[in-house]
Amino acid sequence: MYKYLFCLALIGCACADNINKDAQIRSFQNDATDAEGNYQYAYETSNGIQIQEAGNANGARGAVAYVSPEGEHISLTYTADEEGYHPVGDHLPTPPPVPAYVLRALEYIRTHPPAPAQKEQQ
């Protein structure tokens, strides 16, 4: 019985229709790099993917939006510059808050600098 259900599930997965395989480009804009190195592009597909980016030799800014396989709407904005890639989105993990005792310890260290080291007398 379990073998039958397993085979049936396997066949179902193999035959599942992939929504992304037939996606078509609905709109496309590409402004090639100009003399100063500025560029921008944007496109949208029939399966809901939207991407846009603009930038120059110093960095770029952009946005991406799509629907995840779980049906969640994902929206991401980002900048990329000499300091790295900086994504922003509600779906991204965030670090936990710094505990109060750590903040107190850091404040204590800041307000009580170490005494200057004394040379050993010989």
UniProtKB/Swiss-Prot annotation:
Domain Chitin-binding type R&R: 36-96
One Pfam family hit: Chitin_bind_4
Gene Ontology molecular-function annotations: structural constituent of chitin-based larval cuticle; structural constituent of pupal chitin-based cuticle
Any single GO CC term annotated in Swiss-Prot or TrEMBL for this entry: chitin-based extracellular matrix
Signal peptide from the UniProt entry: 1-16
Alphabetized InterPro entries for the sequence: CHIT_BIND_RR_consensus, Cuticle_Struct_Prot, Insect_cuticle
Tissues expressed in: Imaginal (anterior) epidermis.
Remarks, miscellaneous: The sequence shown is from genomic DNA.
Protein known as: Pupal cuticle protein Edg-78E
Species this protein is from: Drosophila melanogaster
